[in-house]
From Swiss-Prot:
Keyword Calcium: yes
Identification of the protein by name: Parvalbumin beta
Taxonomy, superkingdom: Eukaryota
Record carries keyword Repeat: yes
Gene Ontology CC entries for this record: cytoplasm
Keyword terms: Calcium, Metal-binding, Muscle protein, Repeat
Length: 108
């Protein structure tokens, strides 16, 4: 579970910072939830949780539900938020985020 890696308190703080529509900022979220400071292996574990279909990539539909991985009652990201998140993370332009791209995004 994601709470094995990140504290429930930090997750709650991160989620409350993005409650409002169109308020999602991945840099702020990764910092507030504590993921930005985690070692590579723990970031990889979070990637594996986000990669719901185990394809080795986080695709757009998985990104849209990103917040729900942290708390099932969290909102879905809007189309604009999802596209901006994907654009920020997809450095090779293949339309999805691989594990190395995710590591770079978390640390950006």
């Amino acid at each position: 579970a994601i709470t094995d890696i990140l504290s429930a308190k930090d997750i709650e703080a991160a989620l409350s910072s993005v409650k409002a529509a169109e308020s999602f900022n991945y840099k702020t979220f990764f910092t507030k939830c504590g993921l930005a400071g985690k070692p590579t292996d723990q970031v990889k574990k979070v990637f594996d949780i986000l990669d719901q279909d185990k394809s080795g990539y986080i695709e757009e539909d998985e990104l849209q539900l990103f917040l729900k991985n942290f708390c099932s009652s969290a909102r879905s990201l809007s189309n604009a938020e999802t596209k901006a998140f994907l654009f920020a993370g997809d450095s090779d332009g293949d339309g999805k985020i691989g594990v190395d791209e995710f590591q770079a995004l978390v640390r950006s």
